[in-house]
Amino acid sequence: MGHQAQHGTDDTEELLAAHRQLWCHALGYVKSMALKCALDLRIPDTIDRCGGSATLGELLAASEISASNHDYLRRVMRTLTAMRIFAASHDPAKADDAAAISYQLTPASRLLVSSSSSVDDAAGASKENTTTPSILPNIAHLVRPNTISLLFSMGEWMKDESAASVSLYETVHRQGMWACVEDDAANRASFYESMDADTRLVMQAVVRRCPHVFDGIKSLVDVGGGRGTAAAAVVAAFPHIQRCTVMDLPHVVAEAPAGTAGLSFHGGDMFEHIPSADALMLKWILHDWDEDKCIKIMERCKEAIGGKEAGGKVIIIDTVLGSRADDDDDDKTCRETYVLDLHILSFVNGAEREEHEWRRIFLAAGFRDYKITHTRGIPSIIEVFP
């Protein structure tokens, strides 16, 4: 009997754990929307302007929220604190919640302070953000209604035989994502600001943690480099690179900021021709395309670089799925990359790839070898050699 009772207890514990797990995932959107709420109310900026710590009362005043609604904000902040977006402290000597509770920035929320916050404020503002790139435009773009709403139709889209050629985004919005970006000025601005913000952070990490990747390179082409944000970070960090070209579609490079030091811009189609250089760089490019198109892009890359003995290589900054589970943080990153895979599938029928899928593309395009360097974040650096 004792054994049966223990077995029953184990079953109950397992059921309750499964129940908790399902609720956690089913309500995952609430976490995204709590984050969006904090961005809408400019909470990170307010904390930064208050010197890195702000009371609930200060957040209420800055957000123009009525004191009668203070408990709503307290509960949102409690959730975001549990998510480690913010930190919180409590002064037991103060009875009023608005004065007793104060909130601080964490490494995550420091990334959400707008780029203008610290410089706009007078003395006393936190200076930590001056060396921390803001990814506020990127995160704000990811939690827009237009971004999230299309996921409601994923199941029905998968049943459609045309899904292989028509993305979920196009099915829902009657227009492909790239066309929407170009046809809508507000959407275009949001998209490029989002990409630039992400690029500043990723490239800061790349040039600091993996400088060896750029050793010996005298000429570089950033393929699909947009407005030159990634290339600018490279030439600033590595002055030995004598020639750096940003290649993208003509209408994209036409919007590049004028006078970017050390860069030239080339309008063209990467499926047709890529300018020659010692090395090529592709950041978040190949995950937008199916395998056949990736092979074609890599074939053009191979034509554009010299042999391995001359230092020729392709530098890919992208995700490698399922490659890191050495500790808890790496395991979380691994799970998050699978979510990113569904995100990119929904928008452009793209894919994040496992190492064997990357290898298949490289070999099919005529490359002989590659080396993967993992970062502590989502992207990895893949050096591909002819």
UniProtKB/Swiss-Prot annotation:
GO terms for biological process: biosynthetic process; methylation. Keywords: Methyltransferase, S-adenosyl-L-methionine, Transferase. S-adenosyl-L-methionine binds at residues 224, 248, 270, 283. GO terms for molecular function: O-methyltransferase activity; protein dimerization activity; S-adenosylmethionine-dependent methyltransferase activity; TRIBOA-glucoside methyltransferase activity. Its EC number is 2.1.1.241. It comes from the Eukaryota. It holds the Pfam family Methyltransf_2. It catalyses: TRIBOA beta-D-glucoside + S-adenosyl-L-methionine = DIMBOA beta-D-glucoside + S-adenosyl-L-homocysteine + H(+). O-methyltransferase involved in the benzoxazinoid glucoside biosynthesis. Can use 2,4,7-trihydroxy-2H-1,4-benzoxazin-3(4H)-one 2-D-glucoside (TRIBOA-glucoside) as substrate, but not aglucone TRIBOA, caffeic acid, ferulic acid, apigenin or quercetin. This is TRIBOA-glucoside O-methyltransferase BX7. It comes from Zea mays (Maize). The gene is BX7.
